[in-house]
Amino acid sequence: MIEDKDTKISDEIERREAEDTIAALTGQVACPADKCESKNPHKAGFVNIVGNPNVGKSTLMNDLVGERVSIITSKAQTTRHRITGIVNTPDFQIVFSDTPGVLKPNYKLQESMLGYAQGALTDADILLYVTDVVEDPTKNADFLARVAKEKIPVLLVINKIDLLKTNGDLEAIVARWKQILPNAEVFPLSAKEHFNVPNLMARIVELLPPSPPYFGKDALTDKPARFFVTEIIREKILTNYDKEVPYSVEVIVEKFDESENSIHIMATIFVERDSQKGILIGKGGSMLKKVGTEARKDIELFFDKRVYLELYVKVEPNWRNRENKLKAFGYIE
């Protein structure tokens, strides 16, 4: 027991030393959770999260919101829509938006995804630009140049610092990014480990403009329940399949019948080719059954109800490049 206690004390000392190092690099001062709420008048604002694919934007969003509103996988382009997560206290409301990673589009769906990221630059009160400790700062220079010209507060989040071996490595990374975004405040953190995220949250609260809330105080998101069902199913496809199949998939909920204790859901998975349909279903339907089981369990956790899930697969040729289908699937207004 003595060794366990000593280990915990040692870990806490290391954590505090790391926080002191970050404070010295960035000028931030740690803020206890119960001291971070703003005072009257009420504050509210839109905080948009942008950056390249696979830097941890969705992980950060979920950590800031305190709920799993964005799906997370190791694959790039997991986020296709602009997803809202809302944080409420008596003193403030923060409307976070997670956006697709910035990319050079190869088809119309990706053009729509890029549009969400670009649009996030136009309607934010505060902008979070997320990168990580391995990303090349010159990637997508045109988008970064637009971020650098923003007149609103820009917070540069350097994620995944738990992967670094020395503080010197962090100093070099911060210095490189400050050359590109000289006016941004820098927040090195690990969203996965929840390290330094409270300091980021505290600064966001400080920067919020005075405003009444934009949504009801019990709101978590502006997305309907069906949206989260489709995202959970798509997440299971992304984690169970490789190559082009997960990127060729769209999910539509055809039926969502909710009673007091259960939900009956019927959803269609669209792919672009017959060969993809065969791969998705698997031998004897084994793969589709696996996806359905995994999705059903997560949907039950999300809604805290028993779920009956039926999945069907249909072919919709080249839907990612067809404007009418992108409108039908909610990517284009």
Regions found by a protein language model. Name each.
Residues A225-E333:
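P-loop NTP-binding site
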Residues V50, N54, L60, I83, ...:
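Residue-level signature of catalytic and energy-coupling elements of molecular machines
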Residues S70-I72, K139, P212-G216, T239-E250:
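Active-site phosphate-binding and catalytic loops of NTP-dependent enzymes
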Residues G56, N196, M287:
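Conserved glycine(s) of the Walker
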